[in-house]
Amino acid sequence: MRIDTVNVLLEALPYIKEFYGKTFVIKFGGSAMKQENAKKAFIQDIILLKYTGIKPIIVHGGGPAISQMMKDLGIEPVFKNGHRVTDEKTMEIVEMVLVGKINKEIVMNLNLHGGRAVGICGKDSKLIVAEKETKHGDIGYVGKVKKVNPEILHALIENDYIPVIAPVGIGEDGHSYNINADTAAAEIAKSLMAEKLILLTDVDGVLKDGKLISTLTPDEAEELIRDGTVTGGMIPKVECAVSAVRGGVGAVHIINGGLEHAILLEIFSRKGIGTMIKELEG
């Protein structure tokens, strides 16, 4: 039993050396957020990353919690083409849940486990400048990222803090905008030229004929979208991953956040547990 523990540590050692001092952007959502054991394991993983010299930055979602709060307030959520229709009242609720509740819970749990986390949203220091998303028709205050101003993130990580970001952006019109957390995480990772972007999802990664694909290039990932292998909610995640890699991010990992310690298993082991998208070396 003891030698097994030693072997695990030895397997992790080259990765700890390789990633020391590097920035990881992690999108926290899905099963990892809903299952208590997975949520606790996520917090532990982030703390361990931090203590091995990695600089983690968290971007979180919270769609189910927003819908539940709306129902509690007697407002029925409305979706159009899979996107939440966000009028002014809904945007207030989105901001209340993401910034005022979920963000603070993540920060509290990280700090209770030995971290130094600080909660912010895209409006702080104009981190995320947004504009109205019109691709799916008029769905209200749903935004896309126009620009990322990462100076506040540099200031936080240089002072040993773990930034925890709620994906609420600020428009040049002064309005708040609800931004997809995967998209926000990808754009933030690009602005920082992060070593890794890790997307926690509800599935094991990119699948073909029910089997996990461990590694893909951006070109291969796009071909899987074109040929119908990648469908539904996985399409925007793969598109985010491709955009991030082509924008200078070292690699993107799509993993199942419902698996306890999914981040450590993916990053610190030879085999990994999900799909890694990166350019061919050389």
UniProtKB/Swiss-Prot annotation:
Protein name: Acetylglutamate kinase
GO BP terms in the entry: arginine biosynthetic process via ornithine; L-arginine biosynthetic process
Temperature note: Active from 25 to 80 degrees Celsius.
Entry binding sites for L-arginine: 196, 214, 266-269
Localization terms from the record: Cytoplasm
GO CC terms, sorted: cytoplasm
Keyword annotations of the record: Allosteric enzyme, Amino-acid biosynthesis, Arginine biosynthesis, ATP-binding, Cytoplasm, Kinase, Nucleotide-binding, Transferase
Catalytic activity: N-acetyl-L-glutamate + ATP = N-acetyl-L-glutamyl 5-phosphate + ADP
Annotated metabolic or biological route of this protein: Amino-acid biosynthesis; L-arginine biosynthesis; N(2)-acetyl-L-ornithine from L-glutamate: step 2/4
Chief location of this protein within or outside the cell: cytoplasm
Superkingdom, taxonomy of origin: Bacteria
NCBIfam families: argB
UniProt cross-references to InterPro entries, sorted A to Z: AceGlu_kinase-like_sf (IPR036393), AcgluKinase_fam (IPR004662), ArgB (IPR037528), Asp/Glu/Uridylate_kinase (IPR001048), Glu/AcGlu_kinase (IPR001057), NAGK-C (IPR041727)
Regulation: Allosterically inhibited by arginine.
EC number: 2.7.2.8
Protein family: Belongs to the acetylglutamate kinase family. ArgB subfamily.
Enzyme class: transferase
Subunit structure: Homohexamer.
Function of the protein: Catalyzes the ATP-dependent phosphorylation of N-acetyl-L-glutamate.
GO MF annotation terms: acetylglutamate kinase activity; ATP binding
Residues under site feature: Transition state stabilizer: 27, 237
Positions contributing to substrate binding: 62-63, 84, 178
Gene3D superfamilies: Acetylglutamate kinase-like
